[in-house]
Amino acid sequence: MKFVLLFGVLVVTLFSYSSAEMLDDFDQADEDELLSLIEKEEARAKECTPRFYDCSHDRHSCCRSELFKDVCTCFYPEGGDNEVCTCQQPKHLKYMEKAAGKAKKFGGKIKKWFG
């Protein structure tokens, strides 16, 4: 009975050690992947397309506004056959940015009043 108990403890210890090693390997791989994604995002951020400019060459290249990324919106102008794509900010995001700006100002006033 003691042998079975000792063997069980040994198996559980080895299993937990091996799973901890595997988790460390996964964490390191995730960390490396995250760093490479950040580097790619920084490189891509330097080449963004400003608002109301043509984004048909790369529809994911629109710049970020204060809080949200602009969206490449495509449409056909009236009486035209060619599709036109420009970076634009959706209205609901525009209103959310305005509300966030007003909330920041109001928060600053409250902080000023109650110091």
UniProtKB/Swiss-Prot annotation:
Give the UniProt subcellular location, in the record's own words: Secreted
- Pfam families from the xrefs? Toxin_35
Q: Key word Metal-binding present in the record?
A: no
* Family matches, as InterPro entries: Spider_toxin_CSTX_knottin (IPR019553), Spider_toxin_CSTX_Knottin_CS (IPR011142)
**Which branch of life, at top level?**
Eukaryota
Say yes or no: keyword Disulfide bond present: yes
Q: In which tissues is it expressed?
A: Expressed by the venom gland.
Disulfide bond positions: C48-C63, C55-C72, C62-C87, C74-C85
Q: Which residues form the propeptide?
A: 21-44
Q: Which UniProt keywords apply?
A: Disulfide bond, Knottin, Secreted, Signal, Toxin
What does the entry list under GO cellular component?
Answer: extracellular region
Give the range the annotation lists for the signal sequence.
1-20
Q: Which GO terms describe its molecular function?
A: toxin activity
Q: Of which family is this protein a member?
A: Belongs to the neurotoxin 19 (CSTX) family. 01 subfamily.
Q: What is known of its domains?
A: The presence of a 'disulfide through disulfide knot' structurally defines this protein as a knottin.
What's the protein name? U3-lycotoxin-Ls1k
- The organism encoding this protein is Lycosa singoriensis (Wolf spider)
Q: What is the lineage of its organism?
A: Eukaryota, Metazoa, Ecdysozoa, Arthropoda, Chelicerata
